[in-house]
Amino acid sequence: MELEAKLHEIRKPIMVLGTSSGAGKSLTVTAICRILKNLGEEPIPFKGQNMSNNAWVDWEGGEMAYSQALQAFACGINPSAEMNPILLKPQGNSISEVIHLGKSIGITTASNYYKDWFIPGWEVIKKSLSSIYEKTPNCRLIIEGAGSPVEMNLIHRDLTNLRVAKYLNANCILVTDIERGGVFAQIIGTLELMKPEEKKLIKGIIINRFRGDLSLFAEGKKWIESKTQIPIIGIIPWLNDSFPPEDSLDLLEKKSRHTTAEIKVGIIKLPSISNFSDFDPLENEKSILIEWVRESQNLKKFDFIILPGSKQTIKDQIYLKESGLSQDIKEYSNNKGNIIGICGGLQMLGTSLEDPFFKEGSKSCLEQKIKGIGLLPLKTTFFEKKLTRQISSESLWPCHSKINGFEIHNGKTELVESENLLKIRPIFKDLDLGWYTEKKEGGTIAGTYIHGIFENDNWRDQYINLIRKSKNLPIFNKKSISYKKKRESIIDNLANEFDKHLNITSLLN
């Protein structure tokens, strides 16, 4: 039976819309998911279409946005690509990779996307919704919108917002960020641009990131409710940033919290950075201060530097060379520096990058084969097919430990013979997952394909101890707090804060 015929049987979905990008939709959905889980419900997150290079791989090898994976953790369930059936991974110049139900199906421009992919995209969204309800008929979907639901030039082909809300007859919440100012115009303007049948779906308004004396907003609350005839069901106070921003542009505003830390880490801010959630576990280490490196500089102030993943490795390697950062990294290595590359970062640490199918940002035949930074004797060749899979392995360095994570990458990396480069060893029992070298004069160079490597507590502890030892700092013998337990604690705290200030019960019937 089609889902349309069963809509009267399902639990009323809750949909979180926003007056703009960055209004707080993702965190609101995460909080509601945990609140409902604690109430004994079966919440499942859903976002029809997301645009992000911060991705996760489910247990079937399907790519999905990391924010929906995080929301699944808040529900206490395994993430699935069905929760984010369309993922667009931007590559610059209005070009994106299109992923349907976890599988890459092509590259498109913004103009061609709406022309060629709108109808197939809506079918994929409906297919995912039907599958979710078939597998878990008693679930309650907690749906996240994208950007603003009333972009008038796009609304007729918007797959993520009001089309989904109307299809499921969802109870909708409109979230707005008072921190940005103009909250009255944002709320009224958004609602005025909706059709009457769309506005009827809005059952509550949330004012997010409120600072100061709440009593001073009493008249404002009364005015909004009188003007819209929609109750304000929550005024959420300003909270410390608990999770990474969904958009890499927001990294420019993100600062590490641990200003008295003993270990200083520099992460290279690549133009096409991906999977910056890899560094959340380091952000939660009190002994570590993270700084994002955006321009050429002397890197000696850092105890180790990280070259992160990239959506366009060739393009980002060219950027490193032209900006001078490639030379900075070499000089840092020559001065006993410690370096670790993840995925695209591993590839850039090698001697050469070859892109015969123009998959990784090369724009001409001259860019199809370029030199890497040249610190590891590795050659990477990019192929048309992308590898996405969950990983379970065992590390050989800096400790023997079980390792979990996932891979998302094009290309195969191979060792090359070189008398001028250091000999390298495998980091893991699965030999093609990463390599390292320890230089006689001091310093290490390592690279791995495993995203989520720092979520492995023992591996992270021992790598940090290796750095501490190089600084003549006492090593930590006590195990650090499990990152996954810490993540659970953060989600619980987030849900508790929302629960204090949010009347969710009115939306459950």
Curated annotation (Swiss-Prot):
Gene Ontology molecular function: any one: ABC-type vitamin B12 transporter activity
Pathway: Cofactor biosynthesis; adenosylcobalamin biosynthesis
Active site positions, chain numbering: C343 (nucleophile), H451
Pfam families assigned: CbiA (PF01656), GATase_3 (PF07685)
Domain GATase cobBQ-type: residue ranges: 262-459
Function: Catalyzes amidations at positions B, D, E, and G on adenosylcobyrinic A,C-diamide. NH(2) groups are provided by glutamine, and one molecule of ATP is hydrogenolyzed for each amidation.
Family: Belongs to the CobB/CobQ family. CobQ subfamily.
Protein name: Cobyric acid synthase
